[in-house]
Amino acid sequence: MSHDTYELKAEAREQVGKGSARAVRRNGKVPAVIYGDKQPPLAIALTYKDIYYKIHGGGFLTTIATIDVDGKKIQVLPKDFQLDPVKDFPVHVDFLRIGKDTEVNVDVPVHFINEDKSPGIKRGGVLNIVRHEVEFHCPANAIPEFITIDLTGTNIGDSIHISAVQLPAGVKPVISDRDFTIATIAGSSAMKPEAEETVEVAAPEAAPVAEEK
């Protein structure tokens, strides 16, 4: 199930280009564009505070939003954003316009559960995450919030592949030519070996020294 949707208010921009974008930022707003669904791109300006908290709140690129552009509501999916390299504030956002049959490629986070039920991890093994996110192709209105990997019963040396993940209907991995690995349970150099019984062999007693006569 996807994140809850939300709404943003925006103003249409008549001017585009670097000069116009700088002017928008000077006025405390963030320039953005809405494109796709066989319609011309629409340049807009968003309130800085609203978009800042959405970007840094998590799940921004996997959550459908509604943008109210001067009273006209447009359903969108955030596709990209740029942050200032020094101050980390948003400087531009791209939105994909969502139509009735829109399908998208989107990176979905991977969550792991039941580490305490993994014999391998209990023995000191380490969960080695190969992919923190997996790219999926799916309907825009059915983007998973995350996918879940259950570690119950996993042992050292085990690999978890995409085929082991139960996916919602209509959600397919973009990589389709192989059963790729998402994580492994690896041994740790600090692992304690299983206890083994050791038998101490007593040193033979020295033969008595013969007394000189």
UniProtKB/Swiss-Prot annotation:
It comes from the Bacteria. CDD domains: Ribosomal_L25_TL5_CTC. Pfam families: Ribosomal_L25p, Ribosomal_TL5_C. GO terms for biological process: translation. GO terms for molecular function: 5S rRNA binding; structural constituent of ribosome. Keywords: Ribonucleoprotein, Ribosomal protein, RNA-binding, rRNA-binding. SUPFAM superfamilies: Ribosomal protein L25-like (SSF50715). GO terms for cellular component: cytosolic large ribosomal subunit. PANTHER family: RIBOSOMAL PROTEIN L25/GLN-TRNA SYNTHETASE, ANTI-CODON-BINDING DOMAIN-CONTAINING PROTEIN, RIBOSOMAL PROTEIN L25_GLN-TRNA SYNTHETASE, ANTI-CODON-BINDING DOMAIN-CONTAINING PROTEIN. Belongs to the bacterial ribosomal protein bL25 family. CTC subfamily. Part of the 50S ribosomal subunit; part of the 5S rRNA/L5/L18/L25 subcomplex. Contacts the 5S rRNA. Binds to the 5S rRNA independently of L5 and L18. HAMAP family: Ribosomal_bL25_CTC (MF_01334). This is one of the proteins that binds to the 5S RNA in the ribosome where it forms part of the central protuberance. This is Large ribosomal subunit protein bL25.
